Amino acid sequence: MNKLDQFLTRAEGLLSRLESVLPNAQVNDPDWQAAAAFRWQHGALQPVANFQRIALSDLLGIDDQKERIRQNTHQFVKGGTANNVLLSGARGTGKSSLVKALLNEYAGQSLRVIQIDKQGLVDLPLIVGLVEGRPERFILYCDDLSFNTDEEGYQTLKAALDGDLVAFSDNLLIYATSNRRHLMADYMSDNLATKGDEIHPFEAIEEKVSLSERFGLWISFYPFSQDEYLAIACRWLEHHGWQQGMNDEVRRAALQWSLSRGSRSGRVAGQFAKDWCGRQK
């Protein structure tokens, strides 16, 4: 990216932020019936027409995680109290897919998902204003969330989770996925040294974990066993039309694929199935 492109990108971001804080700035209500999923972009909600159609039954090896978040979401959709959720742990184990499956499960019961990246979190007051008082139930979905020190959006999200953000709406929950349990990078230097004349150095460390503590429900994901990986690969093979099951040849190929990738995640299993089925055409 040349300097002009960098300048234009930064200018566009600045204008977007200015529009959200100007006194006369307005955000138009979207057509909530046009889609079940929306994406917050450039200060507006855009419908996502082709949201991934995945069912809860398609997700293997995470039965406990499925039940915990399904129960929380069920309570919320039915008008009961429920918690904000942090899904954290190993990559490719179904964290994002689980949120998508929940939408497909409950979209017919007025559940809506709004996907937002961490740069857009500073616009949370605008989103709260859009959904407040509406009959639908909304999940604000932050995928692959993590923060660096003093990064934009951190304090806004923290205030929202505390319920301090413009009377945070009772028809809106936050579901976030992250590979980090505490959402912020931990450094050895935080534990081995103090900075300057700081009297209470451990308070800085506690601040780093304080954001994740504000999620009422923590759901952890772990690497899959070999048997779980093969079961997921078999499910994906069936999805792509393979009808010969997990025979010895396919099993060896699936294990070799995972070995070459250094992972037995569900994502890797899906990638293997695509490759294998594509080769059979």
Predicted regions and their residues:
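Phosphate-binding P-loop
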Residues: 48-50, 74-82
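AAA+/P-loop NTPase substrate/partner-engagement loops
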Residues: 105-138, 144-150
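Conserved AAA+ ATPase "SRH/arginine-finger" region at the nucleotide-binding site
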Residues: 114, 178, 188, 195-209, ...
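Conserved catalytic/switch belt of AAA+ P-loop NTPases
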Residues: 149-197
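Pre-Walker A adenine-sensing motif
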Residues: 64-78
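C-terminal alpha-helical "lid" subdomain
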Residues: 2-27, 222-281
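Dynamic helix-loop-helix/coil hinge segments at AAA+ ATPase domain boundaries and subdomain interfaces
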Residues: 2, 44-68
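Walker A/P-loop nucleotide-binding motif
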Residues: 79-101
